[in-house]
């Protein structure tokens, strides 16, 4: 037997940052090395995402248990992969995909396949005595490593908050800095400054799932205004040091072909009108990126949005592309969007995640590696962002250990690699 052979695979039910069960997997090698990883879980999900297998037994965890997925790892996946070399990442992932046999991994569960896929990469890296980011880089011959620009979600509306703001996330991107550590510091300072701005206005400063504030503001523009005040208060310049980014998650307020904004007095917009509304915000404020500006099925609307904003700012497809290379290819062919959000639990294996990242890069699309609203202490996405030189990472606000664990891992990686932080160079329209 060779030392890199997988001798055991074990999974267990653990809790995520929302107190819901998720799955953690261990891949154990002949050498005694153990690789471990956890699957995250989303709140606003695209309809074409790979399936997260839940038990549905209402008497346990309100139906959200993952014992079935755990059992799938401990039986089917165990049988499939024990005896294989851990260094064959693609072959391991392809075995799980073929065994599952469904388009959306509904047989094994994408949470089961992903946890094992990532745990295998952790084990392989440890076996080769390599940091995970370097192992991931080697998988696709990525020779340049870069530190990602963080897209920091500091103010929430939509499905992530109980308020009247329609846009789901208002984020800051600290682009005018020369290192990740400095960019992180700027983000943290703005986060603390925003807290004091909200406090002064008598607004709620409790934080949501991703660590962002969710005050009861009256409109989307009011949310932008308080962030700009916070940036100014810290002494940074909005538009040069720090840019704004939005995640509209507009599928959440798209009904019968109309975009209905409750926060704007139940105003309804056609696709083109809503795209024009977003273009108006871009004109008025230092916004560099808009995610899911239109509904995931509104390809015509997306096409129009891309035609008016695509050469000025980053237009990110999340629910639109769901980290799926096939769907991304359609976007490339139809010139829809210019960026993809990468959430590996939307697709269910590391190999397919890398396929999506490199397909995007080959076609001039930017890539943003992302957490989910239900996270764990697992910081694999930090290594993924550096190891693929993705350029950006979206991993929440500047509080809650489930978010900060990723930032801290990036600080360690920067210290180790001295990888370049490209800041503004990552964006169209800023160069």
Curated annotation (Swiss-Prot):
The organism's place on the tree of life at top rank: Bacteria
Active site feature: 210, 343
Subcellular locations according to the entry: Cytoplasm; Secreted; Cell surface
Enzyme Commission number(s) from the entry: 4.2.1.11
Paired cysteines (S-S): none
Cofactor(s) listed: Mg(2+)
Catalytic activity: (2R)-2-phosphoglycerate = phosphoenolpyruvate + H2O
Function of the protein: Catalyzes the reversible conversion of 2-phosphoglycerate (2-PG) into phosphoenolpyruvate (PEP). It is essential for the degradation of carbohydrates via glycolysis.
Protein name: Enolase
Source organism of this protein record: Acinetobacter baumannii (strain AYE)
Gene: eno
